[in-house]
Amino acid sequence: MFPKFDRHTLLFSANSFAAAMLALYIGFALGLPRPYWAMTTAYIVSQPLAGAVRSKALYRVLGTVLGAAAAVALVPNLVNAPVLLCLALALWVGGCLAISLLDRTPRSYLLMLSGYTAAIIGFPSVNQPGAIFDVAVSRVIEIGLGILCATLVHSLVFPRPVGTVLKQRLFTWLGEADRWALDVLHGEDGEAIARDRRHLAAAASEIQMLAVHLPFDTSRLRETTGVVRAMHERMLVLIPLLSGLADRMEALREIRDDRVRAALNAVTAWIEAGSPRDRGLDLIERLDKLAAHRRGSAWSALLIESLLARLSATVRALAEGHALMARFDDPDAPLSPGLEASTRAKGQRAMHADLPLALLSGGAAAIAILLSCATWILAGWGDGAAAPVMAAVFCCFFAAMDDPVPAIKSFGVYTLLSLPLSAIYMFAILPAIDGFPLLVLTMAPPLLFLGLYIPDPRRAGAALAVLMGFSNALALQEMFSADFASFLNGNLGQFVGLLFAIIVTAGLRSMGVDASARRLLVRTWKSLARLARARQAPEAAAFAAILVDRLGILTPKLAEAGARHDFVGVDALRDLRVGMNLVAVQAARSDLPPEGKDRLDAALDGVGDHFAALAAGAARKPSDELLARIDAALRGLSIASAASAVQGVSGLVGLRRNLFPEAPAFVPEIAR
């Protein structure tokens, strides 16, 4: 019920209040028509981490300018055709929202802001289209002022850097990866380990989202952006590697080969010693030699070969991860030439995006706006412009959620709860206030208290709803005016927009956790089907980036869905392993003779058919024919002499283990 009173929370609330009051003061000093917009904006853009405020600031300003330009272009030209104007603004908001949802970086704010800013400026200006340019300039200055004040205060007054938080998250993640590897090598229950470590995928996605703010950070760690990117690539690869390693250890149960057992013990000792880089290079060379030493085509031999290949890749990823981690404390820490080059690579890994859902969200926003406009026009409601404006804002604010309706309802309820407080201030307290210093003292108690809740993700929505409702209802201007009719009309418009946002979103856009999880699974299965049918391997880290991102989103949804019938037998981590095995197999394909390629292609086509059937809702059990195809491909690849054959065999062994964990042991030769 009560907020946390730690140092970071108190400082955030004080900084946010200072930024809001600074924006309000400058707004008064400049004679802006609605200085309260600057105050409200300062709270909306405030974030606990300074880098997050700074990274979004530029995109927010650009989005506001673009939205204002759209309003200036549309309103004067279509004001005499109200239906067309409403349609144009609704389509603008819906289109901007849909495109913004395809980008989960701070860049998305540019288009989202440009969408609902056009509505904020355009709809209230229909009665005075000739003044649209002046109104647009005023709104841009007011909103830009709020963004600027929040950015300056959170950057200069005891900023909390993203880099410090990110460094701790990376250190914790790498430590958990080390413990996962040790648990696997000590022979712990592989399935239980994988289940316990699935949250590492969600943590990897969270780290990626934090990392996008790092170039804008206030600390010197912003110079380590390339190191974080390279580190994240190793994280993406480690999740399927460690999961696959656990599977091979579980399949082998007991390893009698003394050299292999000694290698496993050496890897265990190396991890326990802190994964020193020099010893890691020696271990990788030793493991690669062991893996290249052919032990025949028996199933146990192929499993050992696959185990050693996985172990070598795991040691490499862990060694590189620890070497990169050392760069945070020592910028001159040595790196191999290849690793050094990876820290200088540009670009960003792709993340999961759902185009159909984005289009549906944009369509729902457009329809909610049009229904609000119809109510406004047909009722002849003079102050009804607030309805389509708030419909646009609500649909945009919560579009990224699976089911936005509960959040929109909650926002509406807390906005309603803010009205009694707003009325007390407007009609009882503010009329007695004279001068800005006294206004600041009067506004401090509610705003400072609400600011304590914003850093808590569970309570931030409720706090912002009360705060925005309170601030917008007061509508502080240079000359105070308390008009009950305007107060009631403006707030009524908000709730009409809220109502249409709820109705349309519930009818078109909302989905439960089951449906959301199912969509993600289907997208993953379709990706695996396409990869299996391709004849060229994608870059491993790039493919892993999307699969791990989906796994991070999917894991909490599957946990919430529980053991429902639709998800019995679903293992998202297994699907990730299958994907990385397919990458390894596709990479080995080009070095095979024609007969080996034909066998491999038949197996890959069978895997593609299996996952395409899964995506279409067919039974989950793979066919015996697919097992026969994989075994035929294994017979050809296990005797191949190409250097890439070890990785190919490891990939096929992984496919067999993941798709047919209960199948009898592979038979190398068919008796004639």
Residue ranges and their predicted role:
Residues 1-216, 223, 323, 327-571, ...:
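A transmembrane helix-and-boundary motif of multi-pass membrane transporters/channels
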Residues 173-184, 188-189, 228-344, 581-672:
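Soluble C-terminal extramembrane regulatory/interaction domains of multi-pass membrane proteins
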Residues 181, 199-218, 246, 282-294, ...:
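Extended amphipathic alpha-helical scaffold segments
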Residues 509, 513, 535-623:
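Extended, charge-rich low-complexity regions and/or helical-solenoid scaffolds
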